[in-house]
Amino acid sequence: DGIFLAGGDQSRYVRYWRGTPVGAALDAHVRAGKPLGGTSAGLAMQGEYLYGAMDGGSQISPRALADPLGADNTIETDFLHIAALKGIVTDTHFSERNRLGRLIAFVAKGESLAGRPLIGLGVDEDAAVAVEGDGTAHVYATSPMAGATVVKGGFAKQAEDEPMQAKRVDTVGAGPNSVLHLPSGRVDRPVFQRHYAV
C-alpha cells in the first residue's frame, strides 16, 4: 500500500506528527520499501531539512535571501528519516512561485544547523519526482517546461542579520529524460546547468 501526504499547512505536519507514532509509522513504511508520495506541503515535508512554515505564512525569495539565517526561514529537521533524501532540503511550486532564491536561502540555513553541505531539490507544480529504493529518480511532467531543480550547497558560512552572500551557486535541471541520483544530487542528461552569484 502507498501513502500520499496532502498539501495544505506544512506547519501542522511538523507540530502534530514530529516525534509521534505517525512519524515513526511513515519512516517504517518507507524502510519497508513501500511508496510514499506527496504534493505541495506533503512533498515539502519529505526532505531531511524542510521549510516548516512555522512563521505563519509562505516565505518569498527576496525576504528569504535578505536574511537567510533569520527567524522567518523556519527550517526544521528530525521529521521524516528517508535515506534517499538525507542531506536534502525540499521545496515545491518551484518555478511557478519563483522559489529559487528561497531554496538557496533554505539550504544556507539548513547548512548552518547541520554543520555540513546540503542540496536543495525544487519541484515544479506540473512535475513529479519518483525515487526508487536505490536513490535513482525520474521526473514525470504534464507540461513540457516542468521539471525539478537541484541547488548544490556547500556555501560559505553566512552572517547573522545579513543578506545571503555566495559568489557561485550551481543549479542543475532534471527533466523527463534525466536521471537524478539521490541523495548525491547528481543528474545524468540534465536539462540545464546554471550558475548564479547571490
Q: Where would I find each of the regions flagged by the language model?
A:
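C-terminal and late-domain segments of enzyme folds
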Residues: 50-52, 56-198
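N-terminal Rossmann-like NAD(P) cofactor-binding module of classical short-chain dehydrogenase/reductase
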Residues: 2-4
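Glycine/Thr-rich phosphate-binding loops of Rossmann-like dinucleotide-binding domains
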Residues: 13-14, 47, 54
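Short, active-site-adjacent cap segments at secondary-structure transitions
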Residues: 10-11, 43-46, 128-130
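Glycine/threonine-rich flexible loop motifs
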Residues: 10-20
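Catalytic nucleophile loop
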Residues: 6, 30-50
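Catalytic-core regions built around general acid/base machinery
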Residues: 19-33
